[in-house]
Amino acid sequence: MAIKERVGLVVSDKMQKTVVVAIENRAPHPKYGKIVVKTRRYKAHDEDNKCKVGDRVRIQETRPLSKTKRWQVAEILNTKA
């Protein structure tokens, strides 16, 4: 089975070793055809606390690390500053 990966934007880094990553999904509405943007937020493990708000990161699925955390930061693609 392939490892699931997502690319998103860090929207919160206020927790220790955890970041919240927002991932946008753009899809046409089934009836009206308008492009609808849906945002999903994932908590991801950041072992070294390197991620900052505004960074674009790649996350990958892992074993459950806590009640709500099932993803880990694989790499930082772009930094904000």
Swiss-Prot record:
Keyword Phosphoprotein: no
Superkingdom in the source lineage: Bacteria
Keywords attached to this entry: Ribonucleoprotein, Ribosomal protein, RNA-binding, rRNA-binding
InterPro entries, sorted: NA-bd_OB-fold (IPR012340), Ribosomal_uS17 (IPR000266), Ribosomal_uS17_bact/chlr (IPR019984), Ribosomal_uS17_CS (IPR019979)
Biological process according to GO: translation
PROSITE patterns cross-referenced by the UniProt entry: RIBOSOMAL_S17
Signal peptide: none
GO molecular-function terms, A-Z: rRNA binding; structural constituent of ribosome
This protein's GO CC annotations: cytosolic small ribosomal subunit
A Pfam family recorded for this sequence: Ribosomal_S17
UniProt subunit comment: Part of the 30S ribosomal subunit.
Function description: One of the primary rRNA binding proteins, it binds specifically to the 5'-end of 16S ribosomal RNA.
Protein family per UniProt: Belongs to the universal ribosomal protein uS17 family.
PANTHER family per record: 40S RIBOSOMAL PROTEIN S11 FAMILY MEMBER, SMALL RIBOSOMAL SUBUNIT PROTEIN US17M
Family matches, as NCBIfam families: PRK05610.1 (NF004123), uS17_bact (TIGR03635)
Protein name: Small ribosomal subunit protein uS17
Organism: Nostoc sp. (strain PCC 7120 / SAG 25.82 / UTEX 2576)
